[in-house]
Amino acid sequence: MKVRSFIMRLKDTGLTAQELKDMVNKYMVETYERYDFIAERAEGMYLYDEEGNAYLDFYGGVAVNSCGNRNPKVIAAIKDQLDDIMHTFNYPYTIPQALLAKKICDTIGMDKIFYQNSGTEANECMIKMARKYGVEKYGPEHYHIVTAINGFHGRTYGALSATGQPDNACQLGFKPMLPGFSYAEYNNLEDFKSKVTDNTIAIMIEPVQGEGGVHPATQEFMKGLREFCDENDMLLLIDEVQTGWCRTGAVMSYMNYGIKPDIVSMAKGLGG
């Protein structure tokens, strides 16, 4: 007999659709303007509500479910892992951790990886690594980073400070932001150069901006940033949280430009 540990269908809760929505509104902090349907299950490219209506899932878990909803191979891999270890800590060696690290490094041509829990944490780590590099090599004032206007790097404090949307609701109410960031116009190499100071240690960029549309970087811009960073001993940090893992034709989006970052962040599609 198949036993469910958690109730998964609305009919099993004894609630109406409106009662469930009211429960969410009562007990959860309202940070999103929700669509007016209940996503009860998913399959492939579709979400289904409690009445069986299908919705084409353009979000993909917001760039997470690259293999589709409930992909059989992904589900099988998760179940196999749960039969061995569900979660452990970093002190023991584990087989999947080692194999995945080698696979990622071999695939994207990097030397090492550092595991995090989310995309915003990966971006926080990039910022910390760049600052550490600048401070240790050049002194305590060398921590300045230039990022793009209308970019998005996450909602934790450092990543939010790197997000070039100072007048957006995502920053309002949380100021002052972490110091050491300047914002330049996307796809404008000269504007980026103008924001660089004697204390700038890195440029942080998304290959495709996803805020307010889909805005890819030009070949000239990305190659120009790489050359400019090389000439001035600055790090090029590329945020591939949304664009990474085959979402733009290449394994990583920066590969479309024939360049290589000093540090790259990834998440979302890496998990599914």
Give the positions of each predicted feature:
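Conserved N-terminal phosphate-binding loop of PLP-dependent enzymes in the Aspartate aminotransferase
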Residues: 3-272
